């Protein structure tokens, strides 16, 4: 079983990102990214996933936020992969439905070792403030690829873009919290008949 913590630093010609993650945390979150709305969403993951998360990022925001958002997803995915270790004894699967007023989203995930993102979200507008909502999919794709998880994100209802985004990130945090729980009945076994994830 892993100690559920990881610190990952990633630097490219476009961005510098550092993520500090504790999956056995209390929901604490700090960030310096230059992207306040993304920070607001990541705070939801930390609070509802009961994980402690620090994200520091700088990037070519003078061009746009794409590289920075994607690389935060990549680095968080790498941190998740490290923190989970060999996944012995973990529940492996998690899901959550989260409402916020008129919005309702469902997130289902599998810490399978098989990166796959299924993202079905239609926002009623292209931006929330100055944040391009297309970048949420880029964030999750980067995360999925490097955490090696299967992730299904479905927005079932919603008219308000902020509400839609918030239900997605809250549901992701809650689903992750379930999947990373240690099950003592497994007695050190993986939740797989293959013997590996």
Curated annotation (Swiss-Prot):
Q: Which subcellular locations apply to this protein?
A: Cytoplasm
EC number(s) stated in the UniProt entry for this protein: 4.2.1.19
A single MF term (Gene Ontology): imidazoleglycerol-phosphate dehydratase activity
* Top-tier EC class: lyase
Amino-acid biosynthesis as UniProt keyword: yes
What main location does UniProt list?
cytoplasm
Q: Name one GO cellular component term.
A: cytoplasm
Q: In which pathway does it act?
A: Amino-acid biosynthesis; L-histidine biosynthesis; L-histidine from 5-phospho-alpha-D-ribose 1-diphosphate: step 6/9
**Which superkingdom is the protein from?**
Bacteria
> What InterPro entries has UniProt attached to this entry?
IGPD_sf, ImidazoleglycerolP_deHydtase, ImidazoleglycerP_deHydtase_CS, Ribosomal_Su5_D2-typ_SF
Task: Please provide the record's keywords in A-Z order.
Answer: Amino-acid biosynthesis, Cytoplasm, Histidine biosynthesis, Lyase
The catalysed reaction is:
D-erythro-1-(imidazol-4-yl)glycerol 3-phosphate = 3-(imidazol-4-yl)-2-oxopropyl phosphate + H2O
Entry-linked CDD domains: IGPD (cd07914)
Q: Does Cytoplasm appear among the keywords?
A: yes
Q: Which GO terms describe its biological process?
A: L-histidine biosynthetic process
NCBIfam families recorded for this chain?
PRK00951.1-1, PRK00951.1-5, PRK00951.2-1, PRK00951.2-4
Entries under PANTHER family matching the protein: IMIDAZOLEGLYCEROL-PHOSPHATE DEHYDRATASE, IMIDAZOLEGLYCEROL-PHOSPHATE DEHYDRATASE HIS7
Family, as annotated: Belongs to the imidazoleglycerol-phosphate dehydratase family.
Q: What is this protein called?
A: Imidazoleglycerol-phosphate dehydratase
